[in-house]
């Protein structure tokens, strides 16, 4: 490892596989205990380092929506320090609250929770944390990637389509109205149990308000104006889905010029004309992959200073092209490119790797007539949700997996959804890519091979039902 004055807080990096997380606390890097992984204060900035194996690292630079400019600056400096100490080869990712990448979210299987304020505003001592407790309400939204965001503790914050957690300190209420989804319910219960058992030493009691109790529990409703207030709760809300945005645009490769001190970009090529040979080791390039995010590629002849500027160049590109600040920005280095980057080049062949494309899994739901698509990173068979339709993209084959409990419209439109996905997608693939429809419980070997392991019995029992998970979590 390089660097002679490594921050003591970074002493464990590179020593073992897995996840390390730090927060910026009073401009100092502070390790986050494993028990608090997945909890983010929206007034702070964080750094996460994931080591898949020695020599394969991903560094994520997370920004809360209320993080100060100074904290963001410290996080950026420390990210460069981590990068330098690991030989300058980690892939760097910029993460924005509410718009985190599927890869980042995959590190937290129970979902993530946003807490108001900064770390200093939170109670950290069991002895006094329940004094003068004020109720907190968390809105748990999402399918596989569940985010629990703190909202105003009032009836107008509730809706019938999502799960909410009412945090009363020594009591936690998981409110699961009829229209909420199976996975949201399971993740909501798991998050409440994690708060009770790990964050608060097992002191709080968890109350589950499901199809029977959701509209009549007097204690829960006392914080929202009484049981009669249930009539004021709105129906489920559909968020504007970002997946299909910008899909009419062309993927573009840009060359970065920083000679004048102000980074400028010039177009190199677009669409199917993008080639690996256009990447010059002496320069930096930006690949705008539309929904695939922004990649800043750094040639191996670039200086350390240029390596450290990569994410800044990416942010400047967003401003210059009037793109949302939450657009994913990832830095990749020559000879250490991930398949998430190389997949956009039709002619990219990596002799070191057997595969130049990593299969992608998407969850597709149509609960109220609005199509919602959500990518699942590091997927397993467990991620196949029987309530929905899933799309497995294997580049030259598209599999539409239809869950047994998908609604009638989802089943009817499954093939059309896959055709729309293929039509809008920008990946360089065979023009005659096949689409196969597969039904839950009847998966062929050609489909199963894309999963790390497969258990034919997984779909034959009720192990993944909400009631069974409730028994397992709160027996």
Curated annotation (Swiss-Prot):
Region (Required for phosphatidylinositol 4,5-bisphosphate binding and regulation): 133-227
Free-text description of this protein's post-translational modifications in UniProt: Cleavage by caspase ced-3 activates its actin-severing function and is required for the elimination of presynaptic components during development.
F- and G-actin binding, Ca-independent: region residues: 240-475
BP term (GO), one: actin filament depolymerization
Any matching Pfam family: Gelsolin
Gelsolin-like repeats (start-end): 27-105, 148-208, 275-341, 375-447
InterPro entries cross-referenced by the UniProt entry: ADF-H/Gelsolin-like_dom_sf, Gelsolin-like_dom, Villin/Gelsolin
Major location category of this protein: cytoplasm
Annotated positions for site Cleavage: 388-389
Cellular localisation: Cytoplasm, Cytoskeleton
Keywords from the UniProt entry: Actin capping, Actin-binding, Calcium, Cytoplasm, Cytoskeleton, Repeat
Mutation effect (residue 388 to A): Loss of processing
Region (Actin-actin interfilament contact point): 70-73
Single Gene Ontology MF annotation: actin filament binding
Region (Necessary for barbed end capping activity): 1-239
SMART domains cross-referenced by the UniProt entry: GEL
Gene3D superfamilies: Severin
SUPFAM superfamilies from the UniProt entry: Actin depolymerizing proteins (SSF55753)
Function: Calcium-regulated, actin-modulating protein that binds to the plus (or barbed) ends of actin monomers or filaments, preventing monomer exchange (end-blocking or capping). Binds actin but does not nucleate actin polymerization, albeit slows down elongation by blocking the barbed ends. By promoting actin depolymerization, required for the elimination of presynaptic components downstream of the egl-1, ced-4 and ced-3 apoptotic pathway during larval development.
Oligomeric and partner information: Monomer. Binds to actin monomers and filaments.
Family: Belongs to the villin/gelsolin family.
Identification of the protein by name: Gelsolin-like protein 1
Organism placement in taxonomy: Eukaryota, Metazoa, Ecdysozoa, Nematoda, Chromadorea
């Amino acid at each position: 490892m390089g660097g002679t004055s490594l921050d003591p807080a970074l002493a464990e990096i590179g020593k073992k596989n897995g996840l390390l997380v730090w927060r910026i606390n009073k401009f100092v890097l502070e390790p986050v205990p494993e028990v608090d992984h997945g909890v983010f204060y929206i007034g702070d900035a964080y750094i996460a380092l994931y080591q898949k194996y020695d020599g394969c690292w991903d560094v994520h630079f997370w920004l809360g929506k209320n993080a100060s400019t100074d904290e963001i600056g410290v996080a950026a400096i420390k990210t460069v320090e981590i990068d330098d100490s690991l030989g300058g080869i980690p892939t760097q990712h910029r993460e924005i609250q509410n718009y985190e990448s599927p890869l980042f979210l995959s590190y937290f299987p129970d979902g993530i929770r946003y807490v108001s304020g900064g770390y200093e505003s939170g109670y950290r001592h069991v002895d006094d944390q329940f004094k003068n407790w004020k109720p907190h309400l968390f809105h748990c939204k999402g399918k596989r990637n569940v985010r629990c965001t703190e909202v105003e503790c009032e009836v107008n914050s509730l809706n019938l389509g999502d799960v909410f957690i009412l945090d009363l300190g020594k009591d936690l209420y998981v409110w699961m109205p009829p229209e909420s989804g199976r996975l949201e319910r399971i993740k909501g219960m798991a998050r409440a149990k994690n708060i009770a058992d790990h964050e608060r030493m097992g002191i709080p009691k968890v109350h589950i308000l499901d199809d029977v109790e959701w509209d009549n529990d007097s204690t829960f409703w006392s914080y929202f104006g009484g049981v009669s207030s249930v009539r004021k709760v709105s129906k489920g809300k559909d968020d504007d889905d970002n997946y299909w945005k910008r899909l009419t645009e062309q993927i573009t490769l840009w060359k970065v010029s920083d000679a004048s001190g102000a980074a400028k970009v010039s177009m190199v090529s677009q669409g199917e004309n993008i080639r690996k040979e256009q990447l010059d080791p002496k320069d930096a390039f930006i690949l705008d992959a539309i929904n695939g995010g922004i990649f800043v590629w750094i040639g191996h002849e670039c200086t350390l200073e240029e390596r450290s500027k990569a994410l800044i160049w990416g942010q400047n590109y967003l401003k210059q092209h009037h793109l949302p600040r939450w657009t994913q920005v990832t830095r990749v280095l020559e000879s250490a490119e991930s398949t998430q980057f190389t997949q956009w080049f039709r002619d990219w062949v990596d002799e070191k790797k057997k595969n130049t494309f990593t299969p992608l899994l998407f969850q597709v739901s149509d609960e109220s007539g609005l199509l919602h698509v959500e990518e699942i990173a590091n997927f397993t068979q467990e991620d196949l949700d029987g309530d929905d339709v899933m799309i497995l993209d294997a580049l030259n084959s598209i599999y539409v997996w239809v869950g047994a409990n998908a609604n009638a419209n989802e089943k009817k439109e499954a093939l059309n959804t896959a055709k729309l996905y293929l039509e809008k997608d920008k990946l360089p693939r065979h023009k005659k890519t096949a689409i196969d429809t597969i039904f839950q419980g009847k998966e062929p070997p050609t489909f199963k091979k894309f999963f790390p392991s497969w258990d034919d019995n997984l779909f034959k029992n009720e192990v993944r039902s909400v009631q069974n998970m409730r028994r397992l979590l709160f027996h």
